[in-house]
A protein has these predicted regions:
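HhH-family (HhH-GPD) DNA N-glycosylase catalytic core used in base-excision repair
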Residues: 1-177
Length: 177
C-alpha cells in the first residue's frame, strides 16, 4: 500500500492506475492471468530509469526505490508498524522520503485499516464531501474535518462511502439511455 500511496500522490486515479499497472507488469510476478505486486526486493533492485519508464516522475521513482530499500534493510516493517498507535505510524512514515500528511492518512486508512483516518488535504475528497455537505462547493481542510466530525471514529470510512457514491452517481449520469 505504501507504494500505491506514492503513485497516487497528486495524480488522477486513472493516471495512478495506469502507472501502477505498468509497475506491476514490469516488476511483478505473473500468476496465471493475474500479477502479484512487486516485492520490495525487486523494486529496491530496479534502477531509477527503469522505475521512471513506468510513468513515475524521477522524484517518485526515488521515493519508491528508497522506500523499498528501507523495507529490505529492515528499517521499516509494516507488520510491526500496524500494531503501533496512529501517532507512532505517522512518525515512522513521515521519516521516509516521499511521505507527507496525505500519504500518511492514506496509509492509515487503506494500509492499516484505521477507519477514522482522513486525508483532509485531498482536493478530490474535499470536492466530493463539499457536494454533500457544502452546498456543492469544495471545502477547505478544516471544513472537511468539521463536516465529517459527526462520523468520528469512522470519518475516513464515511468519506470513502461518499466518494464511492459520488463516482457511481456520476457514472450513471454519463451512461446513455
Amino acid at each position: 500500500m505504501a507504494i500505491i500511496a506514492i503513485t497516487e500522490q497528486q495524480l488522477s486515479l486513472a493516471a495512478a492506475f495506469h502507472i501502477r499497472a505498468r509497475l506491476v507488469s514490469r516488476f511483478g510476478a505473473r500468476l496465471g492471468r493475474l500479477w502479484r505486486f512487486p516485492s520490495a526486493e525487486r523494486l529496491a533492485g530496479a534502477s531509477l530509469q527503469e522505475l521512471s519508464s513506468c510513468g513515475l516522475s524521477r522524484r517518485k521513482a526515488e521515493y519508491v526505490k528508497g522506500l523499498a530499500e528501507r523495507v529490505t534493510h529492515g528499517l521499516l516493517d509494516f507488520d510491526v508498524l500496524k500494531q503501533q498507535s496512529d501517532d507512532r505510524i505517522r512518525e515512522q512514515l513521515l521519516a521516509a522520503r516521499g511521505f507527507g500528511e496525505w500519504s500518511v492518512e492514506y496509509m492509515l486508512a487503506r494500509g492499516f485499516g484505521r477507519a477514522d483516518a482522513l486525508p483532509s488535504s485531498d482536493v478530490g475528497l474535499r470536492r466530493v464531501v463539499g457536494h454533500y455537505f457544502g452546498r456543492g462547493r469544495r471545502l477547505s481542510p478544516g471544513q472537511l474535518e468539521r463536516a465529517l466530525a459527526p462520523f468520528k471514529p469512522f470519518r475516513g470510512l464515511a468519506a470513502y462511502y461518499l466518494a464511492v457514491h459520488w463516482r457511481l452517481r456520476r457514472s450513471v449520469e454519463r451512461t446513455p439511455g
